[in-house]
Amino acid sequence: MAKAAKTIKLEQTGSAIRRHHSQRSTLIGLKLNKIGRTSELPDTPAVRGMIEKVHHLVRIVDEK
């Protein structure tokens, strides 16, 4: 059997208002658009890079 893919659960903690367009686009790419929303994404280098780009606006809730 194949291993289950690792996932990261994120929560948006900061607003995208008055942020650069690239940071807003990154939040949309992470499936986040409002404070308090959560999304579960695969743990890949691309997703980790996106999280690092907006680390001041999101927090990692859970890593599986």
Swiss-Prot record:
The record, for Gene3D superfamilies, names: Ribosomal protein L30, ferredoxin-like fold domain
Q: Set out the biological process GO terms recorded for this chain's protein.
A: translation
CC annotations in GO: cytosolic large ribosomal subunit
Note the InterPro entries from the entry. Answer: Ribo_uL30_ferredoxin-like_sf, Ribosomal_uL30_bac-type, Ribosomal_uL30_ferredoxin-like
Q: Does the keyword Ribosomal protein apply?
A: yes
Name one molecular function that GO assigns to this entry: structural constituent of ribosome
**Superkingdom assignment:** Bacteria
Q: Please name every pair of cysteines joined by a disulfide bond in this record.
A: none
Q: Which Pfam families match?
A: Ribosomal_L30
Provide this UniProt record's keywords sorted from A to Z: Ribonucleoprotein, Ribosomal protein
The text of the family note is: Belongs to the universal ribosomal protein uL30 family.
Q: Quaternary arrangement and interactors, per the entry?
A: Part of the 50S ribosomal subunit.
Supply the name of the protein: Large ribosomal subunit protein uL30
Its ancestry begins with:
Bacteria, Pseudomonadati, Pseudomonadota, Alphaproteobacteria, Hyphomicrobiales
The encoding gene:
rpmD
